[in-house]
Every structure is written in C-alpha cells, then in structure tokens.
Amino acid sequence: MRHQSCRRVTLNYSMNKKKIEIEHTLNSTSRNIVWQLIGTAEGLNRWIADDVKMNGKHIEFAWGDDWRHHETRQATLTFCDRYERVRWQWDDEDDESFVEIRMERSSLSGQYTLHVTDFLSTDDLEWLQDTWSHNFERLRRTSGV
C-alpha cells in the first residue's frame, strides 16, 4: 500500500534538509469541502493529527492518547489564503522549513489536488512518504474524498 496516494514526489535540498513535495488528487469538486479539510482545526483533525487546536496563529497538534504514547507539537500559522493554501512552521524548528498544503482545481475534471510541501532533516525519506500516504488514506476513510 506504500505510496498509492502519491501521484508525484519531488525532492529538493534546502537548509540542510530535504524538501519533499507530494501531490494527491481528491475525489471532490467542492472548494468549500476541500478548504474545510485543510484550513480549519476540525478538518486537520480528521486526517493530520488526533487532535488539532487553533487559536489565532497558534496551532497545537497532538497524536496518540493521554494514557499511552502521546506527542504534541506547536506550530505558528505563517500563511493562510482562503481557498488556496495554508502554511505553518513548527515552533521547535530553528530554520525556515515549513509545512504547506495547497489546493488546486483541475480544469479538465474539476477535481481538487492537494500539493503538500514538507521538510525532512534525516535520511528517512520513506518514513515521511509513508506518513503522508497514511494521512491521505485517513482523509479518504474519514471524509470520502
């Protein structure tokens, strides 16, 4: 099942990190639905993390549960253009890396594609690709897109 949801993966090198770009075509022609999935805490909660909270430009992501393995990360929303893209930087990173999710509508099919940009500081490219593949599969299961 590895990489089934990835249509294209591109690697670039920047800031001593590997920049990865992944495209994933959604089964949706609704910009409102797609925007809700990438531009709101409720939407990100459905596929990025187990719990997402937004307060202004502050975002908190949590994975796992309180009784077992639990990880949280804080981020700052650095760019948000409604119906286009969101970008955040992890607060515990001291470089200019970021996560960006951009939506684009196909002029042929009308379906939306998500373009994800992320950075990896280790050589574990497979781990990051698997993480995003899992996120896209979770998005499909929870939202049907």
Where are the language model's segments positioned?
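Glycine-rich portal/gate segments that line the openings of hydrophobic small-molecule binding cavities
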Residues: 45-92
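Hydrophobic pocket/interface hotspot
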Residues: 33-35, 44, 59-61, 77, ...
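Short, surface-exposed coil-to-beta transition loops
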Residues: 21, 70-74, 95-100
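Short, charged helix-to-loop "capping" segments that act as catalytic/coupling loops
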Residues: 23-33, 66-70, 108-110
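Hydrophobic ligand-binding cavity/cleft-lining segments
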Residues: 3-53
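Beta-strand/loop substructures that line and gate deep hydrophobic ligand-binding cavities in soluble
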Residues: 87-141, 145
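Generic structural detector for well-ordered beta-strands
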Residues: 23-27, 76, 102
